[in-house]
């Protein structure tokens, strides 16, 4: 697909990671005929810089305390705690999978809210994230709308006109604003 775009547009893509201008890792290819586009300068924005101070059901996961990045995925887990994804006799359970990471960046936002959550739980797989079977929901939280906006470098409150679900989906589908602004800043200005 990359080669089709390159051949059709007649320009080579530039790989830019939004982590240089925001608190998320988001590697993307940009095709542009704007000359001399370079990598943006690293602003050193970390996840703690964009998180809201919020209180919620699980107070261990608030700003200022160690939070781990995680994702919630459906898995078929046998009685020994091992994955058996092809064994259709085992029910799918939503697992909180805490990533081993030494970065202070969010993973790439998507249109699926459970792809990125925050938790105080340690690295590993934690079964029954939503407490469907054991009755106790695991301690995690989703990013807020404001945090989504900040991860994509939108102004605070930019999506307030939409309901939260639609806003998060639109933001997850969008571009990182400051990356686009950086690319456009290289347009040559000619005095006429």
Residue ranges, per PLM feature:
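Class I S-adenosyl-L-methionine
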Residues: 1-114, 119-132, 139-141
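Generic structural signal for individual residues within well-ordered alpha-helical segments
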Residues: 3, 51, 149-152, 181
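C-terminal alpha-helix
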Residues: 8, 182-190
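FAD-binding beta-loop-beta segment adjacent to the flavin cofactor pocket
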Residues: 96, 129-162
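Residue-level signal for helical boundary/lining positions with a hydrophobic bias
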Residues: 140, 168-169
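Catalytic phosphate/metal-binding cores of nucleic-acid and nucleotide-processing enzymes, i.e., regions
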Residues: 164-168, 180-181, 185
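A helicase ATPase "motif cassette" and its flanking acidic/Ser/Thr-rich regulatory loops
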Residues: 176
């Amino acid at each position: 697909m990359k080669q089709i775009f390159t051949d059709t547009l007649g320009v080579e893509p530039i790989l830019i990671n939004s982590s240089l201008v925001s608190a998320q890792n988001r590697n993307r290819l940009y095709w542009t005929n704007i000359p001399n586009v370079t990598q943006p300068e690293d602003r050193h924005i970390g996840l703690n810089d964009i998180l809201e101070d919020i209180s919620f059901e699980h107070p261990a996961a608030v700003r200022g305390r160690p939070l781990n990045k995680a994702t919630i995925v459906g898995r078929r887990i046998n009685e020994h705690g091992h994955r058996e994804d092809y064994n259709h006799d085992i029910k799918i359970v939503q697992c909180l999978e805490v990533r081993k990471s030494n970065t202070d960046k969010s993973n790439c936002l998507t249109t699926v809210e459970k792809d990125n959550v925050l938790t105080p739980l340690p690295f590993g797989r934690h079964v029954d994230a939503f407490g469907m079977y054991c009755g106790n929901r695991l301690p995690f939280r989703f990013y807020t709308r404001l945090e989504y906006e900040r991860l994509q470098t939108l102004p605070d409150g930019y999506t307030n006109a939409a309901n939260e679900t639609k806003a998060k989906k639109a933001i997850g589908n969008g571009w990182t604003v400051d990356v686009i602004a950086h690319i456009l800043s290289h347009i040559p200005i000619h005095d006429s």
